[in-house]
Design a protein with these regions (language model features):
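A glycine-/small-residue-rich N-terminal strand-loop-strand element
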Residues: 68-91
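Mid-domain Rossmann-like dinucleotide-binding core that forms the NAD(H)/NADP(H) cofactor-binding site
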Residues: 119-188
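Short helix-loop-beta connector
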Residues: 82, 109-112, 134-140
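Short amphipathic alpha-helix with an adjacent loop that forms part of the alpha/beta core around
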Residues: 191-201
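Glycine-rich phosphate-binding loop and adjacent beta-alpha segment
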Residues: 178, 209-269, 277, 300
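C-terminal hydrophobic helical "lid"/dimerization subdomain
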Residues: 1, 33, 256-300
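A structural motif shared across PLP-dependent enzymes of the aminotransferase-like
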Residues: 90-103
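N-terminal glycine-rich beta->alpha transition that marks the start or flank
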Residues: 11-14, 19-68
């Protein structure tokens, strides 16, 4: 089996596509033959060493947190899925020819592999953020960073819930935001004022996907600081906002099921750019540069 890996922290150029040990499904897990695996910002942050806490790399490093493929091994206690089923979901070290998933759903037959691979992390993260904010029909939510992988999925999931969605992006992505159901505002300095103008005042909730706007500015948009949830600014709690990175907040199997339903009903559209695994360096460079519309996906 081959996998994307690195033997030192650094830029995307340190990545190699080479032989790796074959993983096996543990209890409550499944293994898949990977047909597509997505690239998330966390991947290049890990690659750069930003998440290492200053500790040296112990052995080869592997990347990837979501993928789609065909089930080829079931762990102990797994039910409701069989070898040969086509699935997508979340796991670890998914940028490989085989990968183990710990949360999954059956892939809708109408959805291609790349789109399914892009739905794991984005779907779970979006569902978690909207659930923590308890977004309801008729409410207004501001999503800061609406054109990227998580942001675009969150926009659509909030719209399905009946919310009015305001989302920030570069001007080049405003047309895209309108297509997926959001009122676009320009990101960057002064975004709070632009959100107020679009909303006619305060909003009911803020989902901070980008982590670029000062949290104090985001908190000023809502009546209670706890109505700001961030996945990208780990200092947001200092201003009374909530930070979520998964853990106890996460309900991944429920999230995967919701996303699968939305994909099957064409209520969720995920834009993807695909790259063969031997062009992973290029995909990582694009991800690291930012302002990606939708998701970047690697194909073995």
């Amino acid at each position: 089996m081959r996998a994307l890996q690195f033997s030192e922290y650094g830029s995307p150029e340190v990545l190699t596509w080479r032989d790796a040990p074959l993983p096996h499904a543990g209890a409550g897990e499944i293994r898949i033959t990977v047909r597509a695996a997505s690239v998330n910002p966390l991947d290049w942050k890990i690659l750069s060493g930003a998440m290492s806490g200053g500790q040296p790399l112990a052995g080869p490093g592997y990347l990837g947190f979501d993928a789609a493929g065909v089930v080829d091994e079931l762990g102990e206690g797994v039910s409701g899925v069989s070898v040969g089923d086509e699935v997508f979901g979340r796991g670890q070290n998914t940028q490989a020819e085989r990968a183990v998933l710990n949360a999954w759903a059956v892939k809708p037959s109408s959805i291609d592999w790349a789109v399914a691979a892009a739905a794991g992390v984005t779907g779970e993260t979006s569902e978690r953020g909207l659930r923590l904010l308890d977004v309801k029909s008729g409410e207004t939510i501001f999503i800061d960073g609406g054109a990227g992988g998580v942001g675009a999925v969150a926009v659509q999931m909030a719209a399905v819930r009946g919310a009015r969605v305001i989302a920030s992006s570069s001007e080049a992505n405003h047309g895209y935001l309108r297509e997926i159901g959001a009122i676009p505002v320009l990101y960057g300095e002064g975004v709070g004022g632009r959100v107020r103008a679009a909303a006619g005042g305060r909003v009911d909730a803020v989902f901070d996907v980008a982590g670029k706007t000062p949290v104090e500015e985001l908190v000023s948009l809502v009546s209670e600081p706890s109505q700001v949830v961030s996945i990208a600014n780990f200092a947001a709690g200092q201003a009374g906002a909530r930070v979520t990175g998964g853990g106890a907040d996460s309900k991944p199997m429920e999230a995967m099921a919701e996303v699968a339903g939305l994909l099957a009903e064409n209520k969720l559209v995920i834009k993807v750019q695909t790259f063969p695994f031997d062009r992973a360096v290029e995909a990582y460079r694009i991800s690291q540069a930012g302002h990606v519309r939708g998701k970047l996906v690697l194909i073995p």
